[in-house]
A protein has these predicted regions:
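C-terminal motif of bacterial Sec signal peptides marking the signal peptidase cleavage site
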Residues: 15-18
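Short beta-alpha junctions and helix-cap segments that line functional grooves
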Residues: 141-145
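A generic structural micro-feature
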Residues: 147-151
Length: 166
Protein backbone atom coordinates (compact mmCIF):
# COMPACT_ATOMS: atom_id res chain seq x y z
CA UNK A 1 0.00 0.00 0.00
CA UNK A 2 2.84 2.45 0.88
CA UNK A 3 4.57 1.72 -2.43
CA UNK A 4 1.36 2.47 -4.30
CA UNK A 5 0.99 5.88 -2.58
CA UNK A 6 4.62 6.69 -3.33
CA UNK A 7 4.09 5.75 -6.97
CA UNK A 8 1.00 7.95 -7.22
CA UNK A 9 2.81 10.88 -5.63
CA UNK A 10 5.74 10.45 -8.02
CA UNK A 11 3.38 10.31 -11.00
CA UNK A 12 1.70 13.54 -9.88
CA UNK A 13 5.05 15.33 -9.50
CA UNK A 14 6.19 14.17 -12.93
CA UNK A 15 2.91 15.24 -14.51
CA UNK A 16 3.16 18.71 -12.99
CA UNK A 17 6.79 19.01 -14.03
CA UNK A 18 5.83 18.21 -17.62
CA UNK A 19 3.45 21.18 -17.58
CA UNK A 20 6.16 23.67 -16.69
CA UNK A 21 6.67 26.37 -19.32
CA UNK A 22 10.32 26.20 -20.31
CA UNK A 23 9.94 28.88 -22.98
CA UNK A 24 9.13 31.80 -20.74
CA UNK A 25 12.08 33.89 -21.92
CA UNK A 26 11.40 34.42 -25.60
CA UNK A 27 11.58 37.73 -27.34
CA UNK A 28 14.62 39.58 -28.50
CA UNK A 29 17.53 41.49 -27.11
CA UNK A 30 16.90 44.28 -24.62
CA UNK A 31 13.45 42.99 -23.77
CA UNK A 32 11.80 40.31 -21.76
CA UNK A 33 10.17 37.06 -22.53
CA UNK A 34 6.56 36.26 -22.93
CA UNK A 35 4.65 35.80 -19.73
CA UNK A 36 2.02 33.15 -19.16
CA UNK A 37 -1.63 34.05 -18.63
CA UNK A 38 -2.48 35.20 -15.13
CA UNK A 39 -5.91 33.56 -14.95
CA UNK A 40 -7.67 34.59 -11.73
CA UNK A 41 -4.61 35.62 -9.73
CA UNK A 42 -5.06 38.33 -7.07
CA UNK A 43 -3.61 41.57 -8.46
CA UNK A 44 -1.72 42.33 -5.24
CA UNK A 45 0.03 38.94 -5.22
CA UNK A 46 3.60 38.18 -6.19
CA UNK A 47 2.27 35.60 -8.64
CA UNK A 48 0.46 38.41 -10.46
CA UNK A 49 3.60 40.55 -10.50
CA UNK A 50 5.79 37.71 -11.76
CA UNK A 51 3.43 36.33 -14.42
CA UNK A 52 1.34 39.27 -15.60
CA UNK A 53 3.74 42.19 -15.26
CA UNK A 54 6.97 40.23 -15.56
CA UNK A 55 9.93 40.17 -13.21
CA UNK A 56 12.70 39.89 -15.81
CA UNK A 57 14.29 42.11 -18.43
CA UNK A 58 16.94 40.92 -20.86
CA UNK A 59 20.13 42.55 -22.11
CA UNK A 60 22.43 42.37 -25.13
CA UNK A 61 25.88 40.77 -24.80
CA UNK A 62 28.24 42.88 -22.66
CA UNK A 63 25.66 45.67 -22.32
CA UNK A 64 23.73 47.27 -19.49
CA UNK A 65 21.53 49.43 -21.72
CA UNK A 66 17.76 49.16 -21.44
CA UNK A 67 15.81 48.73 -24.66
CA UNK A 68 12.23 49.82 -25.29
CA UNK A 69 10.74 46.43 -24.34
CA UNK A 70 12.68 46.42 -21.06
CA UNK A 71 11.54 49.97 -20.28
CA UNK A 72 7.91 49.03 -20.90
CA UNK A 73 8.19 46.17 -18.40
CA UNK A 74 9.92 48.40 -15.86
CA UNK A 75 7.22 51.06 -16.28
CA UNK A 76 4.60 48.40 -15.49
CA UNK A 77 6.64 47.25 -12.49
CA UNK A 78 6.87 50.81 -11.15
CA UNK A 79 3.13 51.36 -11.61
CA UNK A 80 2.37 48.12 -9.74
CA UNK A 81 4.87 48.86 -6.96
CA UNK A 82 3.46 52.37 -6.48
CA UNK A 83 0.05 50.77 -5.80
CA UNK A 84 1.62 48.72 -2.99
CA UNK A 85 3.94 51.07 -1.06
CA UNK A 86 4.66 48.43 1.61
CA UNK A 87 6.60 46.39 -0.96
CA UNK A 88 10.35 46.66 -1.39
CA UNK A 89 12.46 45.17 -4.14
CA UNK A 90 15.87 43.75 -4.78
CA UNK A 91 17.12 43.99 -8.33
CA UNK A 92 19.36 41.09 -9.26
CA UNK A 93 21.88 41.59 -12.06
CA UNK A 94 22.97 38.51 -14.01
CA UNK A 95 25.31 37.65 -16.88
CA UNK A 96 25.91 34.66 -19.11
CA UNK A 97 28.75 32.24 -18.43
CA UNK A 98 31.17 33.78 -20.93
CA UNK A 99 33.96 35.87 -19.45
CA UNK A 100 35.61 35.93 -16.06
CA UNK A 101 33.80 35.82 -12.75
CA UNK A 102 35.00 39.34 -11.89
CA UNK A 103 33.92 40.83 -15.23
CA UNK A 104 30.47 39.25 -15.01
CA UNK A 105 29.94 40.41 -11.41
CA UNK A 106 30.71 43.97 -12.54
CA UNK A 107 28.43 43.58 -15.59
CA UNK A 108 25.61 42.25 -13.40
CA UNK A 109 26.06 45.24 -11.08
CA UNK A 110 25.85 47.66 -14.05
CA UNK A 111 22.67 45.95 -15.25
CA UNK A 112 21.05 46.10 -11.81
CA UNK A 113 22.09 49.75 -11.46
CA UNK A 114 20.60 50.59 -14.87
CA UNK A 115 17.29 49.08 -13.79
CA UNK A 116 17.40 50.86 -10.42
CA UNK A 117 18.18 54.21 -12.04
CA UNK A 118 15.38 53.80 -14.56
CA UNK A 119 12.84 52.84 -11.90
CA UNK A 120 13.81 55.82 -9.72
CA UNK A 121 13.52 58.16 -12.72
CA UNK A 122 10.07 56.64 -13.39
CA UNK A 123 8.89 57.59 -9.88
CA UNK A 124 9.78 54.74 -7.52
CA UNK A 125 11.36 55.83 -4.23
CA UNK A 126 15.03 54.83 -4.10
CA UNK A 127 14.63 53.80 -0.45
CA UNK A 128 12.47 50.87 -1.61
CA UNK A 129 15.23 49.46 -3.84
CA UNK A 130 18.41 47.51 -3.37
CA UNK A 131 20.63 45.85 -5.93
CA UNK A 132 22.81 42.76 -6.00
CA UNK A 133 24.95 41.21 -8.71
CA UNK A 134 25.24 37.49 -9.18
CA UNK A 135 27.28 37.72 -12.38
CA UNK A 136 27.34 34.27 -13.93
CA UNK A 137 26.83 32.47 -10.60
CA UNK A 138 23.05 31.87 -10.93
CA UNK A 139 22.28 30.97 -14.55
CA UNK A 140 18.79 30.00 -15.65
CA UNK A 141 20.41 27.48 -17.96
CA UNK A 142 23.94 26.09 -18.25
CA UNK A 143 24.65 25.88 -21.93
CA UNK A 144 26.94 26.69 -24.83
CA UNK A 145 24.72 28.30 -27.47
CA UNK A 146 23.91 31.94 -28.11
CA UNK A 147 20.16 31.38 -27.79
CA UNK A 148 20.65 29.78 -24.40
CA UNK A 149 23.16 32.35 -23.13
CA UNK A 150 20.68 35.13 -23.99
CA UNK A 151 18.36 33.85 -21.23
CA UNK A 152 21.07 34.47 -18.64
CA UNK A 153 21.72 38.13 -19.60
CA UNK A 154 19.05 39.58 -17.37
CA UNK A 155 17.94 41.48 -14.35
CA UNK A 156 15.26 40.08 -12.07
CA UNK A 157 13.06 42.20 -9.81
CA UNK A 158 12.44 40.34 -6.55
CA UNK A 159 9.55 41.73 -4.50
CA UNK A 160 9.36 41.51 -0.69
CA UNK A 161 6.96 42.74 1.94
CA UNK A 162 3.22 43.16 1.96
CA UNK A 163 0.35 40.88 2.87
CA UNK A 164 -0.38 39.23 -0.47
CA UNK A 165 2.95 37.46 -0.88
CA UNK A 166 1.39 34.41 -2.48
Amino acid sequence: MGLRKTGLALAAVLALGACQNGGIFGGGANGAGQTPSSGNIEESSLAYFNTTIGDTVLFVVNEATLGDAAKAILDAQVAWLNQYPDRTITIEGHADEQGTREYNLALGARRAAAVRNYMVSAGLLETRLSIVSYGKERPLAVCSTEACWAKNRRSVTVVAGGIGNV
